[in-house]
C-alpha cells in the first residue's frame, strides 16, 4: 500500500478539501455516509488505488485519510453539519476558538501553536493506520492567516518528524478580484520563505486565473468561492487520479518530484487543465486529444496568470484521463513540439512525460462543469511562473517601505527581521528562475 494523508488547513484549504472529497467519493462510488453505492461490491479504482486515499473500517465503511484544521470553528462546523458529516471521523475535524485574523504571526506563533499538539497527534494516528505512508498532500491558501501561518508551521513539523516522506502542496495564490485582506502579500512572502525548504512540490492555484476561467468558459458572471473550488477540485482530482486509479505515470508522490523538479527550490510547476466547459457548450465541442493538448499551452487554461510564451519549459507531464489512445497523444505532442511558441531550456531533454488514466472525469451534480469523455491536466515547470513572484514581491515592497501593518505581526511575537529575511529569500528565488532560464552555452562563453 502507498497511502497519502490529505491535510486541509484554513478556510480555503477546508473548502477546497470539501469539493475534493465530494468528487473523490463520486469517482470511487462511495456515498456521503461512507458506504458503497448500491450494486457495488468494492469501490471503483481497484484495491490498491482507492486505499491510497480511503481507509476501510471493520464495518465496511470507507473513511478519508484526511484532516481538516482551522483556527475558527465556522468552516469546519459546516463539514460537521453538512451532507458529508458521516464520511469523516469526528476527530479528523479540528477547530479552534479564535481565528488568525489574516495574520501569519498569529497562525505561526501564537494561536496556531496552541492547537499544534492536537493536530500532530491526529496525524500520527492516521499514519499508524498506513502500511506504507508515501507522503502528505496539503491544501491551504498563501494569503490567509491560518493557511499561511499554521500551514507553514505544520510543514516544518512534518519535515522534522517524517523527513523522508513527500510533501506536496496545493497553494492558493491571492488575487485582487477575490481578495479578503490587505496583508495578503505579507502572508504570502512569509509563508513561501518558511516552506521553501520543506515542501517538495507546490502546485499554485491563482484565484484570478480561476476566476477568469469561470467567467469565460463557464459563463458565470460573478463566480463564487464554491464555483472556484469546484474547478480547483477537478484539477486536484486529475493530478491525484494516477495515485487513486491504476495508471502508468506518477503512480507515487516521489515521481512528481523526479519528473518535475530539476533543483530543490524550483519546485513550483504550472498547472493547466482542459477542457473547462459549461454544460450548455459541451455538446458542441469535439474535444479531440490534439485540441485539449494544444489548449493546455494557452495562457487561458492555466491556473496561474503568467505567459509561458515568455519563459522556457524545463519539464512537462501530461496527465490524460478517459477515452484516450496513446497514438493520438504522441501525435498531439509532436504537433506541440513543432510549434515555435513552446521554448524548452537547452540543458534539458525535450521529453514530455505522458500518463494515461482510463477512468473518465466526473463532475459533481451542483457543479457548472460539463461531464466530458476525456480531459488532460498538464504540469509544467516553466520559468514564466516567476512572474507570479514578481507581482507579489512588488506589492510587499510598496507596503513594507512604509512599514504598514507591521506592528500587528511584531505584536504577536514575530521579529521585524523576519520580513527582510523572507523578502531576500524571494528575491533569490526570482534570480534562481532567471539563471535556470539562461542558455547554458551563453554561460560557457563567459569562462
From Swiss-Prot:
Q: Where in the cell is it found?
A: Cytoplasm, Cytoskeleton
Name the major location.
cytoplasm
Q: What Pfam families does the database record attribute to this sequence? A: Tubulin, Tubulin_C
* Residues where GTP binds: 11, 72, 141, 145-146, 180, 207, 229
Top-rank EC class of the record's enzyme: hydrolase
What is the top-level taxon of the source organism? Answer: Eukaryota
GO molecular function, a single term: structural constituent of cytoskeleton
UniProt-recorded name of the protein? Tubulin alpha-1 chain
The species this protein belongs to is: Saccharomyces cerevisiae (strain ATCC 204508 / S288c) (Baker's yeast)
